A protein has these predicted regions:
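Metal-dependent nuclease catalytic cores that hydrolyze phosphodiester bonds in DNA/RNA
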Residues: 1-142
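Mg2+/Mn2+-dependent nuclease catalytic core
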Residues: 119-176
């Protein structure tokens, strides 16, 4: 089996690709059913959106430019109109305090000695495509970070997850 490695593939293009992803494959396993496999993806939560923001800020230089901070109560007319205008321009509105919290988390990650070493030399958001030999099914995966290989050393592939707590016990519960 040989995988095709694609760097710099836009996120929307990756998600539109028809190959089977891990998250869709899980929907085929018991106790799931075909209807769940064919159902639309679940609605994204605020926590998922925050994790995506931290992910982008930590791994993708310049990602902040895709976000526009908007103050105020977004249900009121002026901020609501500003949010709509930002989205119409293809950008993401963000509350300033949410952006500040995400930036702090991304900075902590980048200055942590182990995390910084893992994210030192490589590429973010690397897409992999291959055909499963046993089934002939085309598959896909997206790695948060793919380190550049070093001769004679094991290749480590870090996966960034955000959680309320960094304690091993709490994170273990959240990550299952």
């Amino acid at each position: 089996m040989s995988a095709r490695v694609v760097r710099d593939m836009p996120e929307a293009e990756y998600h539109a690709h028809p190959a089977l992803s891990q998250s869709r494959a899980k929907r085929l396993l018991p106790p799931s059913c075909p209807a769940k496999f064919h159902a639309p993806d679940p609605e994204r939560t605020d926590a998922m959106e925050f994790g995506k923001l931290v992910h982008k800020l930590a791994l993708e230089p310049g990602a902040e430019s895709g976000y526009v901070p908007i103050d105020g109560n977004w249900s009121h007319k002026e901020p609501r109109d500003a949010v709509a205008a930002v989205r119409a321009a293809g950008l993401e509105p963000i509350k300033p305090e949410v952006m500040a919290r995400a930036k702090r988390m991304a900075e902590k990650l980048r200055t942590h000695p182990v995390a910084a070493a893992l994210l030192d030399d490589g590429n973010p958001e690397v897409s992999l495509f291959w055909t499963d030999e046993a089934t002939g099914v085309e598959c896909r995966a997206r790695l948060d970070w793919l380190r550049n290989p070093v001769e004679g050393r094991r290749l480590l592939i870090p996966d960034l997850k955000s959680a309320r707590s960094g304690s091993p016990t709490e994170f273990g519960k959240a990550a299952k």
